[in-house]
């Protein structure tokens, strides 16, 4: 009898494929959207900058004027001791948090909310930023790093600036061990072995005197889990 496929183990949720979220510093999101931010602003001070395992950007611990502490994504150029502002009347300055409707066109922003008060969902990776393209009645258009333009509620908050940690991809890993430990902080199994390179007991494409599939790669949508590899319920295969 063959062994479980990687996709079966991943679906079961074994420790190897489970994200090690217990190593994280905590939730990185905006403070609750209260009247203080809707009508004015609240000041916060950066008291520490932390490395968060599994995240491509550093996070800052910010203490606000009401003694509330939050972990937030910081932009390039922010250091310990600097003040940030959150609210509708905040200044347009890197690190400050404002509703999209109050940010001028062409300003780079990150950590954008999709629903007002959700804490920030879009553009959170190191070195990333989006641009506010235009404003209209009841909507703001933002161009994301992918080039896609998204229509959002003007009350959705965003941070002015570019996420810190840019240029992280410019330095090569050089050694396989470094890449392994880097990806072990995420729910990524690495390296990824090809099915034809495995033994017959490990994969439907394994075994044989040379590396070949040896059977059709198209399988039914309703086939058994241990055989469901390759082109699943494909309408067509090959070059168009």
UniProtKB/Swiss-Prot annotation:
Keywords linked to the UniProt accession: Ribonucleoprotein, Ribosomal protein, RNA-binding, rRNA-binding
InterPro entries in UniProt: NA-bd_OB-fold, Rib_uL2_dom2, Ribosomal_uL2, Ribosomal_uL2_arc_euk, Ribosomal_uL2_C, Ribosomal_uL2_CS, Ribosomal_uL2_dom3, Ribosomal_uL2_RNA-bd_dom
Assembly notes: Part of the 50S ribosomal subunit. Forms a bridge to the 30S subunit in the 70S ribosome.
Gene: rpl2
Name this polypeptide is given: Large ribosomal subunit protein uL2
Gene Ontology biological process terms from the UniProt entry: cytoplasmic translation
A Pfam family per the record: Ribosomal_L2
Function: One of the primary rRNA binding proteins. Required for association of the 30S and 50S subunits to form the 70S ribosome, for tRNA binding and peptide bond formation. It has been suggested to have peptidyltransferase activity; this is somewhat controversial. Makes several contacts with the 16S rRNA in the 70S ribosome.
Biased composition (Polar residues): 1-11
Organism in which the protein naturally occurs: Methanococcus maripaludis (strain DSM 14266 / JCM 13030 / NBRC 101832 / S2 / LL)
